[in-house]
Regions:
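A conserved acidic, glycine/proline-rich C-terminal tail/linker
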Residues: 205-224, 230-231
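Nucleotidyltransferase catalytic core that binds NTPs
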Residues: 2-203, 212, 216, 238, ...
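Short, basic/aromatic-enriched C-terminal tail that caps enzymatic domains
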Residues: 219-220, 229-248
């Protein structure tokens, strides 16, 4: 989708050669049904990439190629970055992410790697991974791409019908509410108001809304001098979505 394509375009604008990896990684899914139903259309993906440039190298391995028939998770020290939010609710998700990204970085000796801030916790995990494993690569953070109504672009949006997509925009509205009120309301009050508001939508099942330190990702209960972000995860009509915004 256009979120992924924005990463590709940024890389092309800054580098001589761009490699795009397309791989649905089985080790980062904690739900078998989620893996089976995750949207995938390699022919459409390749066509979208051709419209940008015919000089893109596409790395689209099979699971056996990456894992050599032995899907085993590596061990990592995330320095607590995986304790909260996605790490709390999705089990070994980040171990799966770090395992496959380590393989990717080892296979493709790139100078830069482009990741979207929509998955901000993942960005921080990979920045930590690069430091821990001493990969000679720099992660470039890329801003979240949204539809006109504010919904963060995601492959999972394809599972939503028109009505559900409209309802899903309330996640971004909740994040914006936090951004508008962070200077005038306490964090507990912001979180409660957001929880109460989203409870009005029977299609939305809130998993978490957290305001956390941008660097160590620890949830905070009082405004601090350091940068922080608001993070949200919810199921909308049975489809799990995540989003975040920088507060200050």
């Amino acid at each position: 989708h256009n979120g992924h394509l924005s990463l590709v375009k940024k890389s092309i604008s800054q580098n001589d050669l761009t490699v795009v990896s397309i791989f649905i990684n089985p080790t980062q899914f904690n739900n078998v049904d989620d893996l089976k139903t995750y949207p995938s259309d390699i022919d459409k993906d390749l066509e979208l990439l051709r419209l940008i440039s015919d000089k893109i190298i596409v790395f689209n391995p099979e699971p056996d190629e990456l894992y050599a028939g032995d899907i085993r998770l590596d061990k990592f020290n995330f320095n607590g970055l995986d304790r909260y939010m996605e790490g709390e609710f999705r089990g070994n998700h980040f171990v799966g992410v770090a395992t496959v990204v380590s393989k990717l970085f080892s296979f493709i000796k790139a100078d830069y790697a482009y990741f979207g801030e929509k998955d901000f916790q993942q960005v921080r995990i990979i920045e930590n991974l690069i430091k821990e494993k001493k990969f000679k690569i720099k992660l470039i953070r890329c801003e979240t791409i949204r539809s006109e109504d504010g919904l963060a672009l995601s492959s999972r949006n394809n599972k939503l019908n028109f009505s559900s997509k409209k309802i899903a925009t309330n996640l971004f509205k909740a994040l914006n509410f936090a951004k508008e009120k962070i200077d005038v309301l306490g964090i507990d009050e912001i979180e409660q108001k957001i929880s109460d508001n989203l409870a009005n939508f029977k299609e939305i099942e809130l998993e978490y809304f957290v305001i956390a330190d941008e660097k160590n990702l620890k949830p905070i209960k009082h405004k601090q001098a350091e940068k922080c972000r608001a993070f949200i995860a919810a199921c909308v009509s049975g489809v799990r979505l995540i989003d975040n915004v920088k507060l200050y």
